[in-house]
Swiss-Prot record:
Residues 394-405, 427-438 have a biased composition (Polar residues). The TXY motif contains the threonine and tyrosine residues whose phosphorylation activates the MAP kinases. It comes from the Eukaryota. Its main location: cytoplasm. Pfam families: Pkinase. The modification Phosphotyrosine is found at Y175. This is Mitogen-activated protein kinase HOG1. Activated by tyrosine and threonine phosphorylation. Its cofactor is Mg(2+). Residues 371-444 are annotated as: Disordered. It is an enzyme of class 2 (transferase). One of its GO terms (cellular component) is nucleus.
Amino acid sequence: MSNEEFIRTQIFGTVFEITNRYTNLNPVGMGAFGLVCSATDTLTSQPVAIKKIMKPFSTSVLAKRTYRELKLLKHLRHENLICLEDIFLSPLEDIYFVTELQGTDLHRLLQTRPLEKQFVQYFLYQILRGLKYVHSAGVIHRDLKPSNILINENCDLKICDFGLARIQDPQMTGYVSTRYYRAPEIMLTWQKYNVEVDIWSAGCIFAEMIEGKPLFPGKDHVHQFSIITDLLGSPPKDVIDTICSENTLKFVTSLPHRDPVPFSSRFQNLEPDAIDLLEKMLVFDPKKRITAADALAHPYLSPYHDPTDEPIAEAKFDWNFNDADLPVDTWRVMMYSEILDFHQIGDPQINTNATFDDQVAAATVAAAEAASKQQQQQQHQTEEQTQQTIASTPPQAQVTPQQLESGANSNSNSNPSFSIGPDPANETLTNFANQADQYVSKFK
């Protein structure tokens, strides 16, 4: 698209550049990695949400994060997941994701009113239906919470914000989800967790929908663990044996033994089927936690359960890029190609269906060509500026190219000596060629 097709405006002090396809911009949310505005899509007359990714190419970490979110949004297509409808790159090289606009989120809804039983059931069913699909694709959401669950006026629910989503891998690192909804294995083991962390988060959300307030509102991770044990009791030996950190192990074993509180006592007004499902979702040992597929078949959700309409992903998500450490320019080329592939236009510089090492090799070469072209443009501009300077210099002060050449080749002390350095464009190409070899060999 040409620059004339973009409209620039300021929102919350942030430049927002969108194509003239979208009108009626209004801010609806601000996060650590982007600003979200509502808008009207003039092609469909439907409301949409437009998320601006802040400075996606400022660092390789941010570039990789944006690439991951884009790949996930392209791959995950399900009724209970937010759907990518458009994506574009602005003249300022910011990336914009366009998705469906939902009227509110579960966090806001819970602040305004208590939920009746049928709404709790229907919302939980849709959350688990979405998780079944996500987990079948080999993806963990990792940050499931009420504010990441969007709802429209028809009570249709969609899970959003896959920026933290990761590969289904038993060797994980670090704290990820918001504390209230964080599974105990993340706090205890740091490295060993899987799709079950999403089931724990969904269980916390289930309880919050029932009570209208968070179940485990920890002030910090120590307090968080403490109030979990107030309900579930001390962690079993099988869980303690998985703790990797010596300090964490000392802390857990130093705590006095606690017996679990029966859920029927804690949730006295809750029907037995709801209590049973909640108990199966909030289990200390992730290996014994119910799966999304089994939870959908639980009697509590029988009013909505339909095994013929609870699809799984057609293919596993390709996480081959996840351990790659690439320069920003390479991520940029790969992202551009993903955008072109989404729109099915143009000639992507790399084949997005190729193996990841082939994509890296192609992207590195493309980045080198772009760098070389930029270098040539800069060199051309410098030559033009030099010619303009010479043209404006008095004749007696001008130095001819022949004089420069004779000066460079002369050994006479009366003539200045000129040192001609390496060609920057050649250096750039050499560096990128070395990088290409390095990255290709890394993935062989």
